UniProtKB/Swiss-Prot annotation:
Native organism: Triticum aestivum
UniProt subunit comment: Subunit of the tetrameric inhibitor.
Classification of source organism: Eukaryota, Viridiplantae, Streptophyta, Embryophyta, Tracheophyta
Role, per record: Alpha-amylase/trypsin inhibitor. It could be involved in insect defense mechanisms.
Name used for this protein in its record: Alpha-amylase/trypsin inhibitor CM3
PANTHER family assigned to the protein according to its UniProt record, in alphabetical order: ALPHA-AMYLASE_TRYPSIN INHIBITOR CM3 (PTHR34481:SF5), TRYPSIN/FACTOR XIIA INHIBITOR-RELATED (PTHR34481)
Predominant localisation class: secreted
Length: 168
């Protein structure tokens, strides 16, 4: 009788352990758990700078963007530096998933605080002459050797199928 209950208990423990292991493996890069949900504001700035060009006050950008730190003359390289720092803070196995999440986010609704870099939402902005699709192509390259040179899952330096989020 004791053997039967011990075997049942061991079997139950094994099943629970396998369920927990499967859940943690599949959800290891969940937004809000593995990385912040208001992530990569500097990468958004850098992507806009590289794909849409440098904008000046009076352009068709939202008013809050014309005063963003990346548009000040003399320091355009800082956007790349800060973007790469933000990406480096995300674990290697979650970088591509963070970029997928970044692409899928809605348009930002409030300005970036230049002191803290905080923004209510991140994501790419659909602009006249610079659609989000064009920006996606550049986002895919952020981890590549010519940009931030950061390893991703499987120790490669690219993110395949970035526009297809795995967390949906």
């Amino acid at each position: 009788m004791a053997c039967k209950s011990s075997c049942s208990l061991l079997l139950l423990a094994a099943v629970l352990l396998s369920v927990l292991a499967a859940a943690s493996a599949s959800g290891s890069c969940v937004p809000g758990v593995a990385f912040r949900t208001n992530l990569l504001p500097h990468c958004r700035d850098y992507v806009l700078q590289q794909t849409c060009g440098t904008f000046t006050p009076g352009s068709k950008l939202p008013e809050w963007m014309t005063s963003a730190s990346i548009y000040s003359p003399g320091k355009p390289y800082l956007a790349k530096l800060y973007c790469c720092q933000e990406l480096a803070e995300i674990s290697q196995q979650c970088r591509c998933e963070a970029l997928r999440y970044f692409i899928a986010l809605p348009v930002p609704s409030q300005p970036v605080d230049p002191r803290s870099g905080n923004v209510g939402e991140s994501g790419l902005i659909d602009l006249p002459g610079c659609p989000r699709e064009m920006q996606w192509d550049f986002v895919r390259l952020l981890v590549a050797p010519g940009q931030c040179n950061l390893a991703t899952i499987h120790n490669v330096r690219y993110c395949p199928a970035v526009e297809q989020p795995l967390w949906i």
